[in-house]
Every structure is written in structure tokens, then in C-alpha cells.
A protein has these predicted regions:
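Short, C-terminally biased terminal segments at protein or domain edges
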Residues: 1-125
Length: 125
């Protein structure tokens, strides 16, 4: 689905970015050679990579600031987990290294974005 953002809505931009990230993860997973080692890794990276956008959508519709932070924390965890599965896939299929780099980089950037949002929205201690 194309980006339907007017360009002014930053939340929608992150929603679109997380959706595109999930699409990239799916495309990457489809390119990984299938064998007994990579099959479970592929399933894991698809789960974590597509979960980022789904959980961000949930955060965007949160009913409270606590709910928002909890959903964003899940986004952060799933982005970090996607980096892990990316690394494991490259270990199992070294020929995937170049295709994995942008996925790993996007996951790292999303992890940092969610970390920053969580820091800014956490109540003072």
C-alpha cells in the first residue's frame, strides 16, 4: 500500500516506516535458502520484523500513556530481536550477508528511535 501521508504527520511516517520495514523483512526472508537450519530462523525473523509495525500501530492507538510506552517497549524489543535473527541467518547462510545489512541497519535505527521516544515519554523519577 502506498504511503498516504501528507508529509506533515510524523506518527504516520513512523507507521509507514515500520510497515515498509516489515515488507523488507518478508522479501529478505523469501530470498534466504531453505534448509533445516534456516527454516526456523526465517520464521523467527518474519515474526519479529513484522511485529514491529503491528505493535507500533497498537501504540499509536493506545488508550493511555502507560499503554503507549508498553507497546513501544515491545516495538523496541522486536527490532532488537530482528537484528539477532538477521545475524543468525548470516551465520547459517553467509551468502546472505549483503542482503542482511540493510535489514540489520533499519532494525538498529528503529531500536534507537523507539529508545529515544521511550526516554522522552517516561515519567520523571
Amino acid at each position: 500500500m502506498p504511503n498516504m501521508s501528507s508529509g506533515d504527520d510524523k506518527n504516520f511516517d513512523l507507521e509507514e516506516r515500520t510497515a515498509v520495514f516489515g515488507e523488507k523483512v518478508i522479501d529478505f526472508a523469501k530470498a534466504v535458502p531453505r534448509n533445516e537450519v534456516t527454516k526456523p530462523l526465517i520464521s523467527q525473523i518474519v515474526r519479529s520484523g513484522t511485529s514491529v509495525g503491528a505493535n507500533y500501530g497498537e501504540a499509536d492507538d493506545a488508550i493511555s500513556s502507560k499503554d503507549f510506552r508498553n507497546k513501544l517497549a515491545t516495538c523496541k524489543k522486536e527490532a532488537r530481536e530482528t537484528k539477532h535473527w538477521c545475524r543468525m541467518i548470516v551465520r547459517a547462510a553467509p551468502e546472505m550477508r549483503e542482503l542482511a545489512k540493510p535489514i540489520w541497519q533499519d532494525a538498529k535505527e528503529l531500536h534507537l528511535i523507539f529508545s529515544a521516544i521511550l526516554r522522552k515519554t517516561s515519567p520523571p523519577k
